[in-house]
Curated annotation (Swiss-Prot):
Residues 158-167 have a biased composition (Polar residues). GO terms for molecular function: copper ion transmembrane transporter activity. It is a multi-pass membrane protein. The chain crosses the membrane at residues 42-62, 251-271. This is CUF1-dependent copper transporter 1. The keyword Transmembrane helix applies. PANTHER family: COPPER TRANSPORT PROTEIN CTR1, SOLUTE CARRIER FAMILY 31 COPPER TRANSPORTERS.
Length: 288
């Protein structure tokens, strides 16, 4: 009977039992005895534990930076651009349609200011604010902006395969070419049509076969499609960035599974500091 095999099995069982006994499955603050990802990474002194805590703190901050960087990349990828959108606190705002609008300087109000002054500062557009046209007899009547009805939207969707967005864009381009593009009445009509289309999409009158969350995220220039075409310069970096985020998430999860209080505190504080530093960048585009 071979006794060497029995001895080897006994040695393996004793090693596994010692390892299971050394792993504490409860919150503890003892120094030494906890493995960090690899068998050789076992801090056994106070200085080594402090170094590990600093490294985990920096890794947690980097994880929140990656989340903010992903939001900046998504903001550019939704516009069909390669790269990422740099954060800025002033200057023109660039929308998905390619237009840019400059922000007015902030207005400071006095606490004792009257309601009349506040109304003068913020005055929303109403149909009476549009341009006025004079009749032959000299009388003046306001021009009511054109808003397409729901039946017109349904007929345009069922009768024609081309999206109504293209027609509105062509009409706007023709108006600009003929010198009418600067007319505030024409701009108001285009804005009113876009708002009516957005409400119809949200109510499910257009693309009713898609979920509500998907209808809200549709690209107005590609209403007939749910997804954008595959691009190597956009989708390959997206996959690599997601893989890096997943790797860091699992590394931090393994750190938390050691139940070491000092390591967990380092990760939690690092995530909080990282969110404080980078959470405001691109937070309006994509959350986490």
């Amino acid at each position: 009977m071979d006794m060497s095999g029995m001895d080897g099995m006994d040695h393996m069982s004793s090693t596994s039992s010692n390892m299971s006994m050394s792993m504490k499955m409860y919150f503890h603050g003892t120094i030494g005895g906890d493995l960090l990802w690899f068998a050789s990474w076992m801090p056994s002194s106070a200085g080594a534990t402090v170094g590990v805590c600093i490294g985990l703190f920096i890794l947690a901050i980097f994880e929140r930076y990656l989340v903010a960087f992903r939001r900046a990349c998504d903001a550019a990828w939704r516009r069909g651009q390669v790269g990422y959108v740099r954060p800025c606190s002033n200057g023109p705002l660039v929308f998905s349609s390619g237009k840019s609008t400059s922000l007015p300087p902030p207005v400071l109000f006095n606490r004792r200011s009257s309601t009349k002054k506040e109304k003068d500062v913020y005055n929303p557009l109403t149909p009476s604010d549009y341009a006025l046209e004079s009749n032959q007899d000299g009388s003046v009547e306001p021009v009511t902006p054109y808003t397409p009805s729901i039946h017109a939207l349904r007929e345009s969707q069922e009768g024609s395969s081309a999206p109504s967005y293209a027609h509105s864009q062509q009409g706007q381009a023709q108006a600009q070419g003929s010198g009418v593009g600067c007319d505030p009445c024409a701009e108001g009509r285009v804005a009113e049509i876009e708002r009516c289309k957005e409400k119809a999409v949200e109510r499910g009158l257009v693309h009713s076969h898609l979920p509500k969350a998907v209808r809200r995220s549709l690209d107005p220039g590609r209403e007939g499609r749910w997804s954008r075409p595959f691009r190597l310069a956009v989708d390959v970096p997206r996959g690599l960035l997601q893989a890096l985020q997943t790797l860091i998430h699992y590394l931090l999860m393994l750190v938390v599974m050691t139940f070491n209080i000092w390591w967990m505190i380092s990760v939690v504080i690092g995530c909080g500091v990282g969110e404080m530093l980078f959470g405001r960048f691109g937070s309006s585009h994509v959350g986490h």
